[in-house]
Swiss-Prot record:
One of its GO terms (molecular function) is cytokine activity. It holds the Pfam family TNF. Homotrimer. Interacts with SPPL2B. Its main location: membrane. It is a single-pass type II membrane protein. Keywords: Cell membrane, Cytokine, Disulfide bond, Glycoprotein, Lipoprotein, Membrane, Myristate, Phosphoprotein, Secreted, Signal-anchor, Transmembrane, Transmembrane helix. This is Tumor necrosis factor.
Length: 234
């Protein structure tokens, strides 16, 4: 029986009883019947809505909370992309804190990573395959006071391509932490100067990449994760 039929039957019953009822007793009977009719109609309407919107009834396709079906094309595509990216070359090397006075990269410390063909040779990362790569590096300089001569800090990422065997700067930055000399009578205050660089480049198999600075004596090794160099195949 449909919801419309149920409502119509209730209305007919009210009309019949209204004609038969009379006096106070009849009024009370009509009031009870009206209340019962309202509850019946409300229940039928609620049941119809639950069935219509699929809250009850046949189970829907399994879904992840707040997301698409686990068998949807979108999820399958993301899974395939994740599996493919796990086979791409990647490297993340950190500064060797046991080599004062020079910037030496190391791939054996904690949080360092070399995967899928990337090599560290002669302080350079060797690209294992053609493709687009994200190249990034950060250094942190630290000093105490400012000298009488200008102080310039440089950070350069260079590429030696297999096709022309010439060292070319592909990312470069320069900073000066000191704008004036610290007076002899003044307290020499510490300063910190970070430099971060990153970019996407088309590289060839066998290309060599280096990250260098001009004043390694100012490098800050106080905390891990402050000086690093890496590449990620895209």
């Amino acid at each position: 029986m449909s919801t419309k039929s149920m409502i119509r039957d209730v209305e007919l019953a009210e009309e019949v009883l209204s004609e038969k009822a009379g006096g106070p007793q009849g009024s009370r009977s009509c009031l009870c019947l009206s209340l019962f009719s309202f509850l019946l109609v409300a229940g039928a309407t609620t049941l119809f809505c639950l069935l219509h919107f699929g809250v009850i009834g046949p189970q829907r396709e399994e879904q992840s909370p707040g997301g698409p079906s686990i068998n949807s094309p979108l999820v399958q595509t993301l899974r395939s992309s994740s599996q493919a990216s796990s086979n791409k070359p990647v490297a993340h090397v950190v500064a060797d804190i046991n080599s004062p006075g020079q910037l030496r990269w190391w791939d054996s410390y904690a949080n360092a990573l070399m995967a899928n063909g990337v090599k560290l040779e002669d302080n350079q990362l060797v690209v294992p395959a053609d493709g687009l790569y994200l190249i990034y590096s950060q250094v942190l300089f630290r000093g105490q006071g400012c000298p009488s001569t200008p102080l310039f800090l440089t950070h350069t990422i260079s590429r030696i391509a297999v096709s022309y065997q010439t060292k070319v700067n592909i990312l470069s930055a320069i900073k000066s932490p000191c704008h004036r000399e610290t007076p002899e009578w003044a307290e020499a205050k510490p300063w910190y100067e970070p430099i971060y660089q990153g970019g996407v480049f088309q590289l060839e198999k066998g290309d060599r990449l280096s990250a260098e600075i001009n004043l390694p004596d100012y490098l800050d090794y106080a905390e891990s994760g402050q000086v690093y160099f890496g590449i990620i195949a895209l």
